[in-house]
Amino acid sequence: MILIIRIFCTSLVISSFYTIQKAILTRDLDFKHIGIISIIAIVISSFVGILMAIYGYGVWSLVSINVINAIISLIIYYYYSQWRPSFSFSFSVLKEHFYFGYKLLLANLLDALFSNSSYVIIGKIYNSYTLGLFTRADGLRKMVVLGISTPLKSVLLPILSTIQGNEVKLKTIYIFVLQIALLLVTPLLLFLIVYADQIFNLLYGSKWDAAIPFFKILCLSSILYPLSTYVVSFLNVKGRSDLVLKIESIKKIALVIAFVITWITKDIYTLLWSLVIVSIIDFMINVIALNIVLKITYRFQIKKTVTALFINLCAISVLYIFLNIVFVDYTKSLLALAIGFVMLPILNFLFLYSINPKLIFQAKHIILNRDSNL
């Protein structure tokens, strides 16, 4: 096992040698080449891994996939990128980057430490059955939320870096991103809450029905999550890694309090609803941080957030009423799932157009002109 871990970890060392090349391509919004490199590396490493598995190499076939993926990526990144490391060293540059970077490192370490803490708490207080239900519900929730927010975040940071000195444009883009993020993520999460029964039965079967209430509350706790990730991008662009660390620290303190209360009450739903409260606290802290850095008033940020949430709630409410009128029990109908999947974005668009048509024209301008000038 020790040898396996040592060989497996070499992929991390190899990956560090093409971090700069990948960052440069990301800065230049060259996601085409990043995607091509990823596909080539995955195809080659997977092919080798499958061959090794066929010839009986067992766990080493899995190890080889990661190591070969890193090696292929390293070779191709050096081929595509013109940047090469020099053998000069500057303590002044190191000091500047270290002062900014160590706070981000601490914030990321805190996040990594607490990322799976819910599983540990549940495993200590409850049985493996409850832990399994929570893990299944949280896994599906993370797949959806991270699947949407992560790509948007990777595009957002390089765009912001080009206008970091323009306070007016940064404010405009933040308000635009705030609303778009809510209008993209919230409808999907509300859709998952309304159709949780059909989705779980379709994906996992009826044996996981007990995880559905967990899933609904976890989706509710994630509605404001994308905003937190995007706020970090804005703070990083302004060089305020100190605020990133403070936000992460306060959030973790709130989580610790939630864990203590859960430990005392021995109630799984106490933990779930505590996560909803923590997400609201996190949002309010982000509002304060953006007020400090970009001078956007609390009232204005909350007004835009509430407006976007109101549009989503109107759309999902109309859909919910319609489903209950048409179907005897929509939670058992796959046809209702298909109808909702089509109707919800249409309803969302109609409510958005009636309440905030300017946002639609801003999004259309960016898509057609491929720039950040709103």
Predicted regions and their residues:
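Hydrophobic transmembrane helix module of multi-pass membrane transport proteins
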Residues: 1-116, 321
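Interfacial/gating helices of multi-pass transporter permease domains
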Residues: 2-3, 96-100, 104, 121-142, ...
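Alpha-helical transmembrane segments of polytopic membrane transporters and translocases
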Residues: 11, 71, 103, 118-120, ...
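Helix-loop junctions and terminal segments of transmembrane helices
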Residues: 26-27, 137, 141-185, 232-237
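Interhelical loop/hinge segments that connect adjacent transmembrane helices in multipass membrane
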Residues: 32, 75-116, 120, 124-125, ...
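Alpha-helical transmembrane segments of multi-pass membrane transport and lipid-handling proteins
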Residues: 47-51, 55, 171-226, 256-261, ...
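Helix-terminus/linker motif at the lipid-water interface of multi-pass membrane proteins
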Residues: 53, 112-143, 147, 158-162, ...
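Membrane-proximal transmembrane or re-entrant/amphipathic helices at the cytosolic face
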Residues: 296-298, 306, 317-374
